[in-house]
Amino acid sequence: MFSSGWVSGLVRGRVSVAATALTAMTMALVLPAAWAAEPLPAPEGPVILLVSGNIAVINTDEGAAFDREMLQALGLTEIETSTPWTDGVPAFSGVLARTVLERVGAEGSTVMASALNDYTVEVPMEDFQNFDVLLATTMDGEEMKVSDKGPIWIVYPRDQHPELQDRRLHDRWVWQLKALRVQ
């Protein structure tokens, strides 16, 4: 019916696909851990974010301090989403919150997000894992200043996920963000 060469090639092909998938899954698990093991350089510019608490990588006595360039070096993401506080559908750019937390080796179930005015709210770690929550530093191409909810604003992709339009989640949209404490 079938030649043994054909069956043997099919088995090798399936093994090859399985090995490739296993390698990709292993890299997805290992790379964030390896990245978190790398030392974090000291900020050269003004610190705009301090991550502290249950983290593995620090660069100050207080935790992991980031200037704007350090955050941008982690990779920028852009999302367009409406907010209850802006007109239209602004385009926000910044680093994903989960990327920052992975970089510092964060372990925990909640993150306390604090603003410059000391407003603090507890954010479930699941938010950062399940959604592309942005630590936005620009809105519509303009660097956000303190007077415009900057230098960092926690932005949820609410237009892409209707469940994020719940008014009870509005407290988590911390603007003028200064610190994240992992618990």
List each model region and its residues.
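Bacterial N-terminal signal peptides
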Residues: 19-32
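N-terminal secretory signal peptides that target proteins for export/translocation
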Residues: 1-14
